């Protein structure tokens, strides 16, 4: 089983690439955002640490963490964002590693993919056999985020500012998928990358 990381800036199309891998290549998806959300629920691995640090002011009436309240704090203060990451990322990474080992033992899938925008910041690349960077021009990403998620320019600016720059991705990862020319082009690029992955495996 190969572990493939899929990363890129917000709105780049990581989920679309992951969906193709699942439907066409029988891959198993590990989504770091989904794990993080589960761990932030009451009783979750990150809940107590986050509430202890940020205070009960971030809670809703039912005791759950209010995502909008927390986001308003961390996206206006980089130090607090870094603190939030330090409280949550190790827990997510631990769960990711656990799932990978379970899938390796089960021998039921050829690929396990990790979808995350924070591949570099969180150290997920070190548990991957290879990492694919999904690249989409920023202007197109902004258009998608406004159209499909209803984000404002201010929200987009804050998120992009706190993610790795395109130059960092290009320096770190040499397997790039260009998502600017339709789904058929994505299919083609994924097939080529998987062919190379298979060839490398056959020679090892």
Enumerate the predicted regions with their spans:
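Short beta-strand-centered segment that lines the nucleotide-binding/catalytic pocket of NTP-utilizing
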Residues: 27-40
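Hydrophobic anchor at the beta1->P-loop junction of P-loop NTPases
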Residues: 6
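ATP-binding Walker
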Residues: 12
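ATP-dependent small-molecule kinase phosphotransfer cores
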Residues: 37-110
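Walker A/P-loop
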Residues: 15
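Small-molecule kinase domains that catalyze NTP-dependent phosphoryl transfer to phosphate-bearing small molecules
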Residues: 96, 126, 147, 151-197, ...
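P-loop (Walker A) phosphate-binding loop of NTP-binding proteins
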Residues: 9
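ATP-dependent NMP and nucleoside kinases share a basic, alpha-helical "lid"
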Residues: 97-106, 112-147
